[in-house]
Amino acid sequence: MTTPYKHEPFTNFQDQNNVEAFKKALATVSEYLGKDYPLVINGERVETEAKIVSINPADKEEVVGRVSKASQEHAEQAIQAAAKAFEEWRYTSPEERAAVLFRAAAKVRRRKHEFSALLVKEAGKPWNEADADTAEAIDFMEYYARQMIELAKGKPVNSREGEKNQYVYTPTGVTVVIPPWNFLFAIMAGTTVAPIVTGNTVVLKPASATPVIAAKFVEVLEESGLPKGVVNFVPGSGAEVGDYLVDHPKTSLITFTGSREVGTRIFERAAKVQPGQQHLKRVIAEMGGKDTVVVDEDADIELAAQSIFTSAFGFAGQKCSAGSRAVVHEKVYDQVLERVIEITESKVTAKPDSADVYMGPVIDQGSYDKIMSYIEIGKQEGRLVSGGTGDDSKGYFIKPTIFADLDPKARLMQEEIFGPVVAFCKVSDFDEALEVANNTEYGLTGAVITNNRKHIERAKQEFHVGNLYFNRNCTGAIVGYHPFGGFKMSGTDSKAGGPDYLALHMQAKTISEMF
């Protein structure tokens, strides 16, 4: 009998005891920086000459780890190992599979600060963001374990006299997991354990920018009793290894989180039936957003400003849920803009060595260059009112940047930047606000700051996003509380951390017995 699910509490860094504990965790992680990590194929460690070098984006001189780089030959071995392991793992009871997740969650919880400290080093996350990332990883394991125990019963269907009908779920097969670097622990862990607990086997190709946390998590799964071959760890390039895994005829399911460009490419490649393939592949994809915070004319100014700031600049705007657009009613536009500038300029952007750092670096040189190029575009399209500068001499640091007076069709209002840049757009009424909010190809998250009940009810119907929030920021979805996934080009609306998610990894089977 399991206890009811509750999300993992966040660490209070106002408590000096927690600060000291986290400093110790950072020291612990520092002791194993630069370590080599092998591939894991069928439970065996495989060292390769080629390496993926993970560096600290806040300190380019600091190597977090060197991870063996897989070739197509390794990818083939991993697929075969997963296919072989599937024949036994699929028949392991759901309760036993769930028990692996419960044990893994407990192990991560006991080392929570250590894992969070690794996220600070590998992704440049501020302490509170790293802590939330680790908490979410724990949540995915706890939530999906409980969900699988419930789904093991199947769903009720009708039976006529003289027959017994059942509707049950069965595993799908080999799952290729391609997670992102931004939620390097939470999404990587969640998309790995969901197929595992549903009876599938996994080939995990982690993000090349952040492979060390994935290697550490695979160790946790093995220590938690996961049999060999159920998870296989093959870091490698998307072009060489990623495409090979997606195209493979033994791949049944692909779960991907990342850019629209890569996601649509995977969707297209997965649709092609390869020689020897005996099934249609499924794709679970989350592909980003261009998310909007709408501020109504009667909004609380402080709440609106805090919501915009948090949505835009948490983890340097490197979230698919980031509120990179502020659509504000003309009556309160100047007040809200001024207050967001004040809040932003009061915060610390630096190497995340202490709890008071609000924003750290962006992930790498490519991201830095892309974001800085968008800032130049913004200078042509709007009015730069804060930030706009960067420094990549020691790490990849960009000041939180605010542009005002953007046209709704401007590039800064339409294209995903994935950095600390927010664009303000003035509207004359709520009709126009909703029109602008819906005018992109994405539909992931959104927020409305208002005290108008009619406008709230209308936005529920007409603001077309997968995750809609009122009178709060549009980031920070919690597993089991705010199932996460978007519409349109934001993905397949596969709600991670929700009651429907595990079923996407399984096949429904109808069984009818006469007696």
Swiss-Prot record:
PANTHER family: DELTA-1-PYRROLINE-5-CARBOXYLATE DEHYDROGENASE 1, ISOFORM A-RELATED, DELTA-1-PYRROLINE-5-CARBOXYLATE DEHYDROGENASE 2, ISOFORM A-RELATED. Keywords: NAD, Oxidoreductase. The keyword NAD applies. GO terms for biological process: glutamate biosynthetic process; proline catabolic process to glutamate. Important for the use of proline as a sole carbon and energy source or a sole nitrogen source. The gene is putC. It holds the Pfam family Aldedh. Induction: The expression of the putBCP operon is induced in a PutR-dependent fashion by very low concentrations of L-proline in the growth medium. CodY represses the operon by displacing PutR from DNA. Disruption phenotype: Deletion of the putBCP operon abolishes L-proline utilization. It catalyses: L-glutamate 5-semialdehyde + NAD(+) + H2O = L-glutamate + NADH + 2 H(+). It comes from the Bacteria. It comes from Bacillus subtilis (strain 168). One of its GO terms (cellular component) is cytoplasmic side of plasma membrane. InterPro entries: Ald_DH/histidinol_DH (IPR016161), Ald_DH_C (IPR016163), Ald_DH_CS_CYS (IPR016160), Ald_DH_CS_GLU (IPR029510), Ald_DH_N (IPR016162), Aldehyde_DH_dom (IPR015590), Proline_metab_enzyme (IPR050485), RocA (IPR005932). Pathway: Amino-acid degradation; L-proline degradation into L-glutamate; L-glutamate from L-proline: step 2/2. NCBIfam families: D1pyr5carbox2 (TIGR01237), PRK03137.1 (NF002852). PROSITE patterns: ALDEHYDE_DEHYDR_CYS (PS00070), ALDEHYDE_DEHYDR_GLU (PS00687). The lineage of its organism: Bacteria, Bacillati, Bacillota, Bacilli, Bacillales. The active site is at 286, 320. The keyword Iron does not apply. This is 1-pyrroline-5-carboxylate dehydrogenase 2.
